[in-house]
Amino acid sequence: MNVLAGKVAIVTGAARGIGAVVAEYLARDGADVVLVGRDERALTAHARHLDETYPERESLAVACDVTDEAGVRAMTEQAVARFGGLDILVNTAGVTGPIETAAQDYGVAEFRDVLDINVVGTFLPCKYVIPHLIARGGGRIVNVAGTSGLRGYPNRVGYSSSKWAVRGLTRTLALELGPHDITVNDVCPNVTKGGRMDRIVAEKARRLGKTETEVYSEYTASTALGRFVEEADVADAISFLVSPAARNITGHDVPVDAGWDV
């Protein structure tokens, strides 16, 4: 179904992982998609794939560091110049930072880096896209928070703090932008199967003296469904939140966690 036909979406972190799947799903649903990230080669390849697979709409790949204000402003202007306006923003860009690291051992530079990418890198695209959503008479913003922003997360102080901040940003913008018919929500994935999770498990196993299989089993045992979340699960939730069916959902967290927070 082309429920997003005629819509223009920006997806940050679109070179790989959740962002790449989100870009695919929005293109599948008919949207023109601006793929944003730092890996220009991967972005260009994915944009080409989307245009070949869904030729009735278009893609634009823009290499951009979401923590760089001038770069985000230029990216937004380039998107508007290409497509004439904007309707949807999905912020998936983010980093994990140090894991299994006590607060007293967590470097200040590392803490700032995680907050810069995860929080400032979510705020800046919002800042520059919002005027264009208002000009369209409405729109959708979806941020990626995480279950680590729903509870305390020991030994991951930078990441957890950043995801709590993203949830606060989401709620504040929902109140500010409601009068403009702009919905703002976030999704909260639990640990998500993929390359980043594989690296986290390997590092956690090394630090704790366990096997990777043991660490994986501990993660899945903590969920009601006994399994990992996959990138497609998160992309499905985001696809719904930017669709017409979600027009009266705003200011909310949508856990995609296989029942971790039950």
Regions found by a protein language model. Give the residues of each.
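C-terminal substrate-recognition "lid" of short-chain dehydrogenase/reductases
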Residues: V3, F123, I134, G138, ...
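Conserved glycine-rich cofactor-binding loop
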Residues: V8, A15-G17
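Conserved glycine-rich Rossmann-like NAD(P)H-binding loop of the short-chain dehydrogenase/reductase
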Residues: D29-H46
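Substrate-binding pocket helix/loop in short-chain dehydrogenase/reductase
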Residues: I99-A103, G107-R112, I141, Y219
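Active-site helix of classical SDR
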Residues: C126, S162, T170
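Residue(s) in the substrate-gating loop at a strand-loop-helix junction
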Residues: G146
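Short, small/polar-rich loop/turn modules that mediate ligand/substrate recognition or access, typified
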Residues: G178, T183, I249-G251
